């Protein structure tokens, strides 16, 4: 069985996507470079002040974290992977093992801002689901059931793998591998989608038309995103492609499923890591980062739905390939 398709279509699409993907790559590279400038620089060493405990994360760092989280959370490029990359450049990262654990927890908790943004954008769908729970909206009930089914695999597997993933996969090499592999998967899924649209196929499904098997399949696809650099959004959108959802509907199901999954992940991480976070991070920067994440996520979500309807995933394939190559070079040259 051939798992990796020919890369010839990538070469054909190069003229279409190269300029856009390279511009996005340069933009995020600019954020990475400037993130260090946004952080508070320590002054000259002063023996008298070393004994005074200072906040572990500055407001400048919080803004950078929030912006990167909001922009990348719902794009198929891995927000966690980007946040880990950014955190490696932050001064607060080099303040001991406990601070590193606090930052790793904050990288998950900051998703609360992005969650709120999507909840506001899809408030009608959420209201329909609520009415469905009350037995007043059959359409909303079917959608809610599908989302719960898709959430179950991550809910059952996630808590058991959380510590193992953080200890083994929160690094440059695992992120680079996941970015590269994800690019190949997206290219294959997009090529398959185009062939299906050009040929004879069954009508594409609506969100309410998903059955138990399709919803569960998307849920298991989401579990692969526990590996940083993979992207929860990418795996669920690709899963939607494979069960017959059109591009925009696959993205919308990914966003709605993300509301449940990200809320659970942020809540779980907040409860289990609250002590280390509260003792190392001030509330001001934490809340500021969440607000920035919410504002940038709102723009990102609206843009992505429109873009996918017109262009598909091609630009993100190129972005992930370029970024993975850069990270590989950084890792093996250090």
Predicted regions and their residues:
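Multi-pass membrane proteins that catalyze or facilitate reactions on polyprenyl-/lipid-phosphate substrates
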Residues: 2-334
């Amino acid at each position: 069985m051939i798992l990796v398709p020919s890369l010839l279509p990538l070469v054909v699409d190069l003229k279409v996507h190269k300029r856009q993907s390279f511009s996005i790559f340069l933009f995020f590279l600019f954020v990475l470079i400037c993130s260090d400038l946004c952080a508070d620089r320590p002054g000259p060493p002063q023996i008298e002040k070393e004994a005074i405990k200072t906040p572990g994360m500055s407001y400048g760092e919080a803004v950078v974290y929030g912006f990167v989280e909001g922009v990348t959370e719902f794009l198929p490029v891995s927000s966690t992977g980007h946040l880990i990359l950014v955190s490696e450049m932050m001064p607060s990262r080099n303040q001991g093992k406990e601070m590193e654990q606090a930052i790793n927890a904050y990288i998950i908790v900051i998703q609360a801002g992005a969650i709120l943004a999507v909840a506001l954008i899809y408030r009608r769908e959420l209201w329909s689901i609520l009415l469905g729970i009350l037995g007043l909206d059959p359409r909303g009930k079917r959608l809610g059931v599908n989302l719960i089914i898709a959430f179950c695999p991550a809910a059952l597997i996630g808590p058991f793998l959380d510590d193992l993933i953080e200890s083994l996969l929160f690094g440059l090499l695992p992120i680079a591998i996941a970015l590269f592999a994800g690019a190949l998967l997206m290219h294959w899924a997009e090529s398959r989608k185009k062939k299906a649209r050009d040929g004879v196929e069954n009508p594409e499904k609506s969100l309410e038309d998903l059955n138990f098997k399709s919803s569960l399949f998307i849920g298991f696809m989401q579990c692969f995103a526990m590996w940083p650099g993979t992207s929860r959004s990418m795996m669920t959108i690709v899963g939607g492609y494979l069960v017959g959802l059109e591009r925009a509907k696959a993205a919308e199901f990914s966003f709605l499923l993300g509301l449940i999954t990200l809320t659970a992940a942020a809540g779980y991480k907040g409860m289990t890591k609250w002590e280390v976070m509260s003792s190392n991070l001030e509330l001001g920067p934490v809340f500021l980062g969440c607000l920035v994440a919410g504002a940038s996520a709102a723009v990102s979500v609206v843009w992505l739905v429109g873009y996918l309807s017109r262009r598909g995933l091609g630009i993100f394939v190129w972005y992930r390939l370029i970024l993975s190559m850069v990270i590989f070079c950084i890792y093996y040259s250090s």
